Amino acid sequence: MQHRPINLEEKFGLFHEQWQPKVIAEMNEYQFKVVRLEGDFVWHSHEDTDEAFIVLDGVLRIDFRDGAVNLGAGEMYVVGRGVEHKPFAEHEVKLMLIEPRGVPNTGDQGGARTAQNDVWI
């Protein structure tokens, strides 16, 4: 068994497309995903799970029907299960998501922004 740390900058260097989460590690049934975001996403919710957003670079706004939260580099926020939300980034954001394996990025909405799931880099 090889014991090596995962270098996040190296992982971000392997892809440039946005809104396409890539799995970099798994712990129990949870996946750690890195993703580049810019612009507006779709309103959606995840009925069966919470979703953790950790901003590594840039500024992310997560809109809710009753307000918003702004996250800068080094900050995180957990969106509770069933809470409708919509991420937005004026400029590119590098982000880590932590969520159970198999959770679609568009939650209950589906559509053109739905990324292929379980893509490892």
Residue ranges and their predicted role:
Residues 1-33, 110-121:
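A short, N-terminal "cap"/entry segment at the start of jelly-roll beta-barrel domains
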Residues 17-18, 31-47:
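Conserved short histidine dyad/triad with adjacent acidic residue
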Residues 28, 56-57, 72-73, 91:
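A cytosolic small-molecule/anion-sensing beta-strand core signal
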Residues 31, 40, 59-61, 68, ...:
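Structural motif
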Residues 36-37, 46-63, 98:
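Short, conserved beta-strand element in jelly-roll/cupin
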Residues 64-65, 73, 89, 107:
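Short glycine-/acidic-enriched loop or helix-start segments at secondary-structure transitions
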Residues 65-82:
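Short acidic-glycine-tyrosine-enriched beta hairpin
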Residues 81-111:
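Ligand-binding loop in jelly-roll beta-barrel domains
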